[in-house]
């Protein structure tokens, strides 16, 4: 029995849900999201609550049960409130700026790195070393953040690189002479 999957998803005011077999369309004040689910699950809407149930008792159906419930819950939160991620850049001369539809990163390379900003993500750079990402889709927001972090991942010796705001980087000692 999935502890996550058996919980109903309450639909808040201002959010509408459309069901078409395994396709879920959710719209709210921040935008609209839709997703088609695969697997042995059934999604039903009753009394302003969404319920996800497995159709079989096998392992893959139970795994998809909790996963589908979490994804739908994140979709509801995304269209109602949205998601926000904060990235921090550490290092001498490392900085970020937004130019048009590109994020321009200066990360001590021989060239500046340009990353195209997806249409569903808003980026704010209040300081040169802080990037704030906002969007309705939690999965796509995390994927875009990982693309940015991949440009210069944090290293354990001096702590230079791009990391999530609350991420802890374990530090190592340098060479001993």
Curated annotation (Swiss-Prot):
One of its GO terms (molecular function) is structural constituent of ribosome. GO terms for biological process: cytoplasmic translation. The keyword rRNA-binding applies. Keywords: Ribonucleoprotein, Ribosomal protein, RNA-binding, rRNA-binding. One of its GO terms (cellular component) is ribosome. InterPro entries: Ribosomal_uL6-like, Ribosomal_uL6-like_a/b-dom_sf, Ribosomal_uL6_a/b-dom, Ribosomal_uL6_bac-type, Ribosomal_uL6_CS. This protein binds to the 23S rRNA, and is important in its secondary structure. It is located near the subunit interface in the base of the L7/L12 stalk, and near the tRNA binding site of the peptidyltransferase center. Part of the 50S ribosomal subunit. NCBIfam families: L6_bact. Belongs to the universal ribosomal protein uL6 family. This is Large ribosomal subunit protein uL6. It comes from Rickettsia akari (strain Hartford). The gene is rplF.
